Amino acid sequence: MKVRVKAPCTSANLGVGFDVFGLCLKEPYDVIEVEAIDDKEIIIEVDDKNIPTDPDKNVAGIVAKKMIDDFNIGKGVKITIKKGVKAGSGLGSSAASSAGTAYAINELFKLNLDKLKLVDYASYGELASSGAKHADNVAPAIFGGFTMVTNYEPLEVLHIPIDFKLDILIAIPNISINTKEAREILPKAVGLKDLVNNVGKACGMVYALYNKDKSLFGRYMMSDKVIEPVRGKLIPNYFKIKEEVKDKVYGITISGSGPSIIAFPKEEFIDEVENILRDYYENTIRTEVGKGVEVV
């Protein structure tokens, strides 16, 4: 008895939506297989030697243990992970494994949990990975489309399906940025003027999605006065790239805590922007909005 799922990468923050906004991407993605075993243990196999297989240190193992204990499942699981989402890339690598595992266990043992509860369980993996039980990556990984995490106790997630074409380019630098470290450099306090700016622009981005206004969405996304100016310094050539493509994209910003860069190119410039990004970072991919974890 086993279930195999495809768990997509995600892009959190999207400029002004720090720790709130998340967007599901169609690819890259992890492939996760969860198999029920009679021995009451959790076995993890992963094709990336840099990822621990100890279930107490692996995000998938932590999520699995929490769900098995909470529902007194009485069996163990073997979790096989084929990583497609690079760790430390700012594309929700730990979230993909966490969300995929939660989804697969729910399917395998017919727990009938709703998506919000799956987000809650998946966020236990994020707690182990980044030191915070944040859900801005696992929420879009589960729901698909665009999500907003608006509360934690209790957990509340608002979901906006994206029903229009939105071209996306992801440039993935060959460096890693640790999420914990990327949080430590952030300002401890925010000025009132910057707060008003970010709240206003975040509201505008939601309005833009409902009105399918790519231009407004991208323009407001690039208006962050708090997080991007600090984290952008960690990414080689980030501000140079942003300046070079500014007239050819609806928007461009840091994906999550970086170093990946997410761009929404204008239709007539998609090839040109892709080539510019690839000139700086060979690992540049073209993708689109994803639908969330699914059984394969």
From Swiss-Prot:
The keyword Kinase applies. Gene3D superfamilies: 3.30.230.10, GHMP kinase, C-terminal domain. It catalyses: L-homoserine + ATP = O-phospho-L-homoserine + ADP + H(+). Catalyzes the ATP-dependent phosphorylation of L-homoserine to L-homoserine phosphate. Its EC number is 2.7.1.39. Keywords: Amino-acid biosynthesis, ATP-binding, Cytoplasm, Kinase, Nucleotide-binding, Threonine biosynthesis, Transferase. Belongs to the GHMP kinase family. Homoserine kinase subfamily. HAMAP family: Homoser_kinase. ATP binds at K86, A87, G88, S89, G90, L91, G92, S93, S94, A95, A96. This is Homoserine kinase. It holds the Pfam family GHMP_kinases_N. It is found in: Cytoplasm. The lineage of its organism: Archaea, Methanobacteriati, Methanobacteriota, Methanomada group, Methanococci. One of its GO terms (molecular function) is ATP binding. Pathway: Amino-acid biosynthesis; L-threonine biosynthesis; L-threonine from L-aspartate: step 4/5. One of its GO terms (biological process) is threonine biosynthetic process. The keyword Glycosyltransferase does not apply. GO terms for cellular component: cytoplasm. It comes from Methanocaldococcus jannaschii (strain ATCC 43067 / DSM 2661 / JAL-1 / JCM 10045 / NBRC 100440) (Methanococcus jannaschii). SUPFAM superfamilies: GHMP Kinase, C-terminal domain, Ribosomal protein S5 domain 2-like.
